[in-house]
């Protein structure tokens, strides 16, 4: 009997741990117990006893508009609220007076979650999926369409926050009419925050906290657009907290006022209690009007990788008041005007493209920001992104863009996969050409690129063809190209600057050749009628000459500069010519490593060295 009692108790405990599925419709149907769609529970009935259900229960909401009660209950258990994935959307609306606009008489909050759990504690995991939050009219402190407080983990997926308005403006307890997140860990995936409006402190989203271990927010594949606030973040206000992660996301076309601290994303600086670290990766922040795209106070802490941040050219892309605590780049970014009030510790990489000339128009042209750039080189490869994610301890999926499109092995920076900026060069019948570009690029099929590592006084060059087809060529590489006659198009790439030992230099436009070496002479790539293709003086006595755009030239100093030219027929490839068989010693092999009986015409290997037998 004792054994049976224990077994029964175990069964009862186990059954209590299983989640129950409930089905909800606006008015309910059948028996209204939520056991099926035919017996769906009415929304108002569900709300009236929301905390009587078991932690982990799942609520499926039929498509339709759910008008929230006048006083929204505080939800203290971990549930899943799942709206319709097809057909009529599931909408939580605050439009109580049914006039179609947020105003007096409408609800100030649509859902309030307060789980009383620590950061990362998923014992009360709350999931929101496929729900639109709209029509909240915030006219009191600490309210929002979605308010989350003191909750260790809330996941919000494929939700829309549209046309929520905040008119409250007292005691700094305002802003964030779409989402007010307090001392919580919230992850947004595939969500949209559009057309929300606040007097200030976050046109759509406000993040705040009260402790050193709380306040972590992540946006992955999200769109924040069309929101308004007079100051302190037309899109996002990062007040207090530890981390704000913007990944594979777009923040665009939000509107600030004209006075005060104005910008799309605003953050107070780091301090002992609040790290306030912003991480922007694989994201696009562009086309926001009024102030900077990203604005930070003293001690701002920002990390950026493989992203695009550009304004209209009249205001900064990034503006940091006084000296920031950290502006760390992992490279592969396109950044517009960068403004810091005092000297900073910004560590831009040579793979970053930072220029005041990078603007909304120059990068996106006639494209909407959501359609991706028209003039961006490739950014980081997937291998490079994985290294960055590991270094920054990011556990997010970086393999897809905001639309769920695969980034493949390589893609342009920012949130949207798009065609990369292209470069061009031609190779003639001579099978040689030179090429230089400020960006890196992918070597096309059938072409190899070499650096000149040495020049001999007798007029020969040592060329290392280290960049084969498909390889990534570093930025600012001046190369000798060898391949079949053709006009080639190359995909340009943000890449670290070349550190190759190379006597070739180049220019991105028509410019005079230069060198830091005393007595250096300059050689132009040309086809000499007597000596053939090679590098020859481009001006009298090897003086400087005007080099063509995207072409390489040769710089030689020292004894070898006595040579007037270096014909490519005299390139030192490491292969020696042998015509006297009697001087050969040792076993003879072909290039496939097979031993030969005696010398045969062509290239062979003797004692580890290559020889040409004629």
Language model region names:
Residues 121-231:
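Right-handed parallel beta-helix
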Residues 54-100, 115-131, 157:
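Beta-solenoid repeat scaffold
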Residues 25-62, 403, 589-597:
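Acidic Gly/Asp/Thr-rich repetitive segments characteristic of extracellular carbohydrate-active
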Residues 420-445, 468-532, 539-574:
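A short, polar beta-strand/turn micro-motif
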Residues 44-52, 67-75, 113-115, 296, ...:
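Short, T/G/N/S-enriched strand-turn elements that build extracellular solenoid repeat scaffolds
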């Amino acid at each position: 009997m004792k054994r049976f009692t224990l077994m029964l108790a175990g069964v009862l405990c186990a059954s209590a741990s299983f989640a129950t599925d409930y089905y909800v419709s606006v008015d309910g149907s059948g028996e209204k117990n939520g056991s099926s769609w035919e017996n769906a529970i009415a929304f108002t009935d569900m709300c009236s006893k929301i905390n009587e259900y078991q932690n982990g229960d799942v609520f499926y909401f039929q498509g339709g508009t759910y008008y929230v009660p006048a006083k929204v209950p505080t939800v203290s258990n971990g549930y899943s609220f799942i709206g319709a994935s097809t057909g009529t959307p599931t909408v939580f609306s605050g439009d109580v007076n049914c006039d179609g606009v947020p105003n007096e008489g409408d609800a100030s909050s649509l859902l309030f979650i307060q789980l009383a759990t620590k950061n990362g504690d998923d014992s009360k995991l709350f999931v929101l999926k496929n729900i639109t939050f709209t029509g909240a009219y915030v006219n009191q402190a600490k309210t929002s369409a979605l308010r989350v407080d003191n909750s260790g983990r809330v996941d919000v997926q494929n939700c829309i926050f549209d046309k929520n308005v905040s008119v409250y403006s007292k005691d700094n307890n305002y802003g964030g009419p779409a989402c007010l997140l307090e001392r919580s860990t919230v992850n947004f995936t595939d969500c949209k925050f559009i057309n929300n409006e606040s007097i200030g402190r976050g046109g759509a989203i406000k993040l705040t906290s009260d402790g050193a271990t709380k306040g972590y927010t992540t946006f992955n594949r999200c769109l924040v657009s069309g929101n308004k606030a007079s100051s302190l973040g037309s899109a996002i206000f990062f007040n207090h907290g530890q981390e704000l992660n913007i990944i594979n996301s777009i923040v665009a076309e939000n509107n600030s006022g004209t006075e005060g601290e104005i910008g799309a994303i605003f953050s107070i600086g780091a301090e002992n209690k609040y790290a306030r670290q912003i991480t922007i990766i694989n994201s696009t922040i562009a086309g926001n009007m009024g102030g900077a795209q990203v604005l930070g106070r003293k001690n701002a802490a920002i990390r950026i990788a493989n992203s695009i941040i550009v304004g209209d050219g009249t205001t900064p892309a990034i503006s940091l008041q006084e000296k920031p605590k950290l502006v760390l780049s992992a490279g592969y970014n396109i950044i517009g005007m960068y403004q810091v009030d005092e000297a900073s510790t910004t560590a831009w990489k040579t793979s970053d493209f930072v220029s005041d000339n990078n603007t909304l128009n120059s990068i996106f042209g006639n494209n909407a920001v959501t359609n991706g750039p028209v003039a961006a080189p490739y950014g980081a490869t997937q291998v490079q992104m994985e290294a960055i994610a590991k270094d920054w301890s990011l556990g997010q999926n970086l393999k897809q863009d905001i639309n769920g499109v695969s980034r493949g092995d390589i893609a342009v920076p920012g949130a949207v996969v798009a065609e990369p900026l292209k470069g061009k060069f031609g190779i003639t019948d001579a099978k040689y050409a030179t090429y230089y570009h400020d960006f890196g690029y992918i070597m096309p099929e059938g072409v190899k690129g070499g650096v000149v590592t040495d020049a001999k006084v007798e007029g020969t060059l040592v060329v290392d063809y280290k960049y084969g087809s498909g390889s990534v060529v570093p930025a600012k590489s001046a190369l000798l190209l060898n391949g079949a006659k053709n006009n080639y198009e190359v995909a340009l790439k943000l890449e670290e600057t070349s550190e190759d030992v190379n006597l070739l230099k180049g220019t991105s436009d028509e410019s005079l050749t230069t060198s830091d070496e005393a007595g250096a002479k300059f050689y132009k790539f040309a086809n000499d009628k007597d000596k053939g293709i090679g590098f020859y003086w481009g001006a009298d006595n090897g003086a400087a000459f005007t080099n063509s755009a995207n072409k390489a030239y040769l710089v030689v100093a020292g004894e070898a500069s006595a040579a007037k030219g270096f014909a490519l027929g005299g390139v030192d490839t490491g292969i020696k010519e042998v015509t006297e068989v009697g001087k050969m010693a040792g076993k003879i092999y072909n290039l496939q490593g097979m031993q030969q009986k005696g010398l045969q015409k062509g290239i062979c290997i003797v004692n580890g060295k290559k020889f040409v037998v004629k």
